[in-house]
């Protein structure tokens, strides 16, 4: 089940489908560099498809295993509940389509390419009687910018198209897989893929490496730094009592 989910996400079922051509595709920026002040950005994808073909563009982050803790609200409190293992969780899943997916592709075609929230839920192992988990997980991912999947956001001028994606403030190092699909009569025709490396630099890279190598020491250092900043603020802006 886990392996099948990962295959769905990456669209490797393409080998079983008819041969397709390649779309001309480019992404800007070609590389993402995260400094300490990184707070998200915009990734623009441009390409060329045959006039009349519908276009779907997807940005897929690194896929990894992840444990998600479902939280439930009890009165004013949020309590930790069920722990859910996500077999193939992408760092980000961003999708733009010219029209609703159900108008562009047959259900089995979209599912085979891992396109849409239904295919994503299946890849995560949250289909069937676990769809209630997918609904809550996707709500959280949308709020953090990790998930965005819907129609619109693609501009066309003849055969040329462009899509813009808002990137979240937190991106792990790795490679974003940018894919474009030309849809024709319910099937995927041409497609194109380009990779966008994500790298941390400067102090952000140092802190990330410190957190990875010495998590306990990093946590202690972060706590001491927060305490020091609090003391400095207290000294700089002393509380004045009313007379």
List PLM regions with ranges:
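Structural beta-strand segments of beta-rich domains
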Residues: 39-45
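Short, aromatic-rich amphipathic segments at membrane interfaces
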Residues: 189-220
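Juxtamembrane interface at the cytosolic side of transmembrane helices
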Residues: 219, 227-243
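N-terminal edge beta-strand
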Residues: 21-38
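Membrane-proximal low-complexity regions enriched in glycine and acidic/polar residues
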Residues: 71-172
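Extended, hydrophilic extramembrane loops/domains of integral membrane proteins
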Residues: 170-200
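Aromatic/hydrophobic beta-strand junction motif of beta-rich domains
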Residues: 45-49, 163-165
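Bacterial N-terminal signal peptides
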Residues: 5-14
């Amino acid at each position: 089940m886990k392996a099948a989910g990962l295959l769905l996400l990456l669209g490797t079922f393409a080998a079983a489908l008819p041969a397709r051509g390649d779309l001309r595709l480019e992404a800007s920026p070609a590389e993402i560099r995260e400094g300490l002040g990184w707070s998200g950005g915009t990734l623009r994808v441009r390409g060329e498809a045959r006039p009349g073909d519908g276009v779907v563009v997807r940005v897929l982050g690194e896929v990894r295993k992840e444990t998600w803790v479902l939280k439930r609200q009890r009165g004013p409190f949020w309590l930790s509940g069920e722990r859910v293992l996500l077999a193939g969780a992408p760092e980000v899943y961003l999708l733009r389509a010219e029209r609703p997916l159900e108008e562009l592709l047959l259900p089995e075609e979209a599912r085979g390419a891992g396109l849409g929230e239904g295919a994503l839920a299946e890849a995560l192992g949250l289909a069937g009687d676990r769809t209630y988990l997918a609904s809550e997980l996707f709500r959280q991912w949308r709020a953090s910018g990790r998930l965005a999947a819907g129609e619109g956001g693609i501009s066309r001028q003849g055969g040329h198209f462009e899509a813009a994606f808002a990137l979240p403030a937190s991106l792990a190092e790795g490679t974003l897989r940018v894919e474009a699909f030309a849809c024709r009569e319910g099937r995927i025709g041409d497609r194109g893929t380009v990779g966008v490396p994500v790298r941390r630099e400067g102090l952000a890279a140092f802190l990330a490496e410190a957190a990875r190598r010495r998590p306990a020491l990093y946590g202690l250092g972060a706590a001491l730094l927060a305490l020091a900043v609090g003391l400095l603020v207290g000294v700089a802006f002393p509380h004045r009592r009313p007379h």
